[in-house]
Amino acid sequence: LVDCGMEQGPDLYVNQDIPVNPSEIDYILITHAHIDHSGNIPLLVKKGFSGEIITTFATADLCDIMLRDSAHIQEFEAEWRNRKARRSGEPEYEPIYTVADADAATKLLAPVDYGQKITLCDGIEVRFNDVGHLLGSASIEVWVTEGEVSKKIVFSGDVGNKNQPIIKDPQLVKEADYVVIESTYGDRTHGEDIPDYVGEFTRILRETFQKGGNVVIPSFAVGRTQEILYFIREIKEKNLLPEFPGFEVYVDSPLAIEATNVFNKNVKGCFDEDAMALVNQGINPLLFQGLKTTITSDESRQINFDTKPKVILSASGMCEAGRIRHHLKHNLWRPECTICFVGYQAVGTLGRKLIEGAQSVKLFGENITVNAKIEVLRGISGHADMNGLLDWLAGFEKVPDRVMVVHGEDTVTDHFAALVEEQFGCPAFAPYSGGSVDLATNEIITIGQKIPKKA
């Protein structure tokens, strides 16, 4: 099994059961640690999976903290629902999985190095290659032999955006009979220019600090928070804000703090040339004067009693949960403050409402007027765009026998599959859930079924 993620957020597809008994699976291969790729693995363990979970060292470290965090959220949500259920006499809600299930899953992690070809069992070999999406992220080459027939399948995982800070650009793979590729941005581009993140971010900080306000950044705890710390270290090192030399930066997310420690542990083999040049000079690319971390709720609350202009980085990135909602409550109404978005905001989320110009939002049962300036750091993305995906596919020296397009909205997967056929001249297939292909004959067996959305 390659990846087993969890659907998250409102109005998304039901988490479907996989079409095999988890106890019959021997190996799970994980491309990277994001919950939409790893989040359902503890559920498989709960249902009987006891094999090995193969992934890179950095992904194993991130899964160790992220799956436990996900389990804490399931338990907290179940307890909240059950308090309401007990009052109304409804049956109790069981969490999807527990912290004990997540702990059991992490004990099955079996990490490997990038570029290391390993034999899983008779007839199956695998190799993980850096795909530049997140620390530890990989595309996976799988060699399968059955009888006299051998085929090679390459799973792209999530292909990274070029020129991201800290991590390397996506590595190309030279050959495959079949390719399974993501298509998150398979119908759009990020723009031709490399954005000047540091320059734009410096402008936002200067304009806000001059008014005496805070810059509040809703940020994904893993990946995006570390990129922002990287930019701020550069701003401070180059003295780009000489009028505010000692400004403080709070990372107010226990998961983000743990993830930053994982980044610092997995420097070699994961960091790009620029980040490694700093490391080799004895400089931690994610550390600087004025950086403060808050673990406890009390420490978090104290941030809003400090009147000095500062940066507050907190999760969740779409403002749907977590400590960020408290910081929004204390800063949204203040015209001198700025809320700076640095990641995708899904439809229906509080973050999306704010970037679309909401004049008032409800937080903790209270209507909060939006007086703060809303900024978006454009172009910052961990995903390759349409051209980046095509560039990655162009790395194959021989055109694959077939390309399977997954991991995108249904109209986007169809669009990108047509684009692949047009550009490379090979059959491309955008399956629905349950779609299947005979790898020996290259025939589509089933197209699959569109999954109904939740009511």
Model region roles, listed by residue range:
Residues 1-29, 38, 45-227, 233-244:
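His/Asp/Glu-rich metal-coordinating catalytic cores
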Residues 48-52, 211-213, 244-247, 336-337, ...:
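A short helix->loop->beta-strand "cap" motif at the edges of active sites that frequently abuts
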Residues 52-60, 83, 180, 245-258, ...:
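Short internal beta-strands
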Residues 74-79, 267-281, 362, 445-455:
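A polyampholytic, Gly/Pro-enriched intrinsically disordered region
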Residues 124-128, 262-270, 390-391, 440-451:
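Short, surface-exposed amphipathic charged segments that create phosphate/polyanion-binding patches used
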Residues 202-347, 362:
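Hard-cation-handling environments
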Residues 362-393:
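Generic long, charged, amphipathic alpha-helical segments
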Residues 389-426:
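C-terminal structured "cap/appendage" subdomains that terminate the fold
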